[in-house]
Regions:
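Low-complexity, acidic/polar, glycine-enriched regions of mature
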Residues: 20-181
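Bacterial Sec-dependent N-terminal signal peptides
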Residues: 1-23
């Protein structure tokens, strides 16, 4: 009898812990590096792995560089080349961060919340600290998060000829969207 009660208590506790950690393999990261010279440098990766711990505010993203899709295959080839993203040597971009105003985000109550996020963004093997905001919407037990920010390519040692020629923005806009169920 005691072992049955203990098993039930442990099962309930593990469900509660599991419910605090949300994951997805279909988050999206899009970037727009268009300039007045070239409107083509836009890409999207719809297979980003993301995790959110609603108890601690910990949030992580991992994106395979080769999974960014461009409208023009030639641009995708340049993007992955050694003189640009060098995706053979740096196959992933990652973000490890925290919601710093977690007390203002109620994951158990429907609504839209503004989250302050800080963390480390690693691209091209270079880690930089970033701060941004995210819009978090809770509805029907689903958590949707969206964030938009810019990065400086030179901060990540991305200096392809397209950047110096003005064909690619030196500060592309990054948009991250994720749905945690």
């Amino acid at each position: 009898m005691k072992s049955t009660i203990l098993s039930v208590v442990l099962a309930i506790a593990s469900i509660a812990v599991f419910a605090q950690k949300k994951t997805t393999t279909s988050a999206t990261i899009a970037f727009d590096a268009t300039t007045s010279i070239d409107a083509l440098p836009k890409a999207e990766n719809k297979t980003v792995v993301a995790a959110l711990d609603t108890k601690t505010g910990s949030i992580q993203f991992e994106a395979a560089i080769k999974s960014f899709a461009f409208s023009n295959p030639r641009i995708q080839q340049h993007f992955n080349a050694a003189n640009w993203m060098d995706s053979d040597n740096f196959p992933k971009a990652t973000f490890n961060g925290t919601i710093t105003n977690l007390a203002k985000v109620n994951f158990s109550k429907e609504g839209t919340y503004t989250a302050d996020v800080e963390g480390a963004l690693t691209i091209h093997g270079v880690e930089q600290k970033i701060k941004t905001t995210a819009a978090i919407t809770v509805k029907g037990g689903v958590i949707n998060a969206t964030s938009e920010f810019s990065i400086k390519l030179e901060d990540y040692k991305v200096n392809g000829a397209q950047v110096t020629s003005g064909k690619v923005s030196k500060e592309p806009k990054i948009t991250v969207t994720s749905e945690f169920k």
